[in-house]
């Protein structure tokens, strides 16, 4: 079990839910990194004795390196920019941090069924998709021990934490998954006895039984 984790992009929805979960159910020490966190995070989080808050962007090398110093594992809440991911990889390498979990979008490898793939790419800006693809490529080409979590379409439901893991190369049929389920999946991965299946792996997270042509909430 890890003792020290850094969460990059700590103001994101999944990042905030993960922060709350880790503070409630573990004794981990969290370093939260992102822009304007003092106004975007709840005061209880900002003042928690096991939380260190560092404000900055991914393009601020000194602050970024400060944030990952002493981290045993780093969580990247969004992989949307190749240049940002390159900066993260550089900071982790300089501080000798090897373990990283990053959130990416599903569908970049043609793993969606045709109808869901068409709906997905019809509803996302080309620039966003390109940024996701570039960021993923940067991480995969690094020497880090990464786990890329490929997420289908997201929604919120605190009562629904159902998820399934879809290995790389397997068709990804699930059209949706809750952010709460994603947090549970991350929590479970952090607690596995054998991390081998997650080493330098790309794994999808979906909600079982949601084999739709588009998310049910659209």
Predicted regions, residues:
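Core catalytic loop region at the nicotinamide-binding pocket of NAD(P)H-dependent oxidoreductases
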Residues: 192-215
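Substrate-positioning beta->alpha
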Residues: 149, 173-188
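N-terminal Rossmann NAD(P)H-binding glycine-rich loop of SDR-like oxidoreductase domains
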Residues: 2-25
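Conserved glycine-rich Rossmann-like NAD(P)H-binding loop of the short-chain dehydrogenase/reductase
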Residues: 26-35
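Residues in the short beta-alpha loop(s) of Rossmann-like NAD(P)-binding domains
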Residues: 11, 35-38, 106
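Glycine-/Pro-rich loop/turn segments that contact NAD(P) or position catalytic residues
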Residues: 80-166
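A conserved pocket-lining segment of Rossmann-fold NAD(P)-dependent short-chain dehydrogenase/reductase
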Residues: 163-177
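NAD(P)H-binding glycine-rich loop region in Rossmannoid oxidoreductase-like domains
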Residues: 5-6, 17, 37-94
């Amino acid at each position: 079990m890890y003792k020290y984790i850094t969460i990059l992009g700590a103001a994101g929805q999944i990042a905030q839910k993960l922060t709350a979960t880790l503070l409630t159910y573990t004794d981990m020490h969290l370093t939260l990194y992102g822009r304007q966190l003092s106004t975007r995070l709840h005061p209880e989080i900002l003042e928690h004795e096991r939380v260190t808050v560092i404000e900055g962007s991914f393009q601020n090398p000194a602050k970024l390196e400060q944030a990952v110093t002493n981290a045993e594992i780093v969580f990247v809440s969004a992989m949307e920019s190749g240049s940002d991911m390159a900066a993260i990889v550089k900071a982790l390498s300089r501080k000798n941090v090897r373990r990283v979990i990053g959130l990416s979008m599903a569908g970049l490898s043609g793993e969606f069924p045709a109808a869901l793939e068409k709906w997905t790419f019809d509803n996302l800006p080309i620039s966003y998709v390109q940024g996701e693809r570039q960021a993923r490529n940067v991480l995969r080409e690094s020497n880090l021990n990464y786990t890329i979590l490929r997420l289908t379409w997201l929604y919120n439901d605190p009562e629904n934490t159902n998820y399934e893991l879809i290995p790389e190369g397997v068709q990804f049929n699930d059209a949706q998954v809750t952010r709460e389920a994603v947090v549970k999946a991350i929590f479970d991965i952090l607690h596995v006895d054998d991390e081998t299946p997650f080493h330098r792996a790309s794994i999808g997270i979906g909600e079982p039984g949601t084999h739709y042509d588009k998310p049910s909430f659209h």
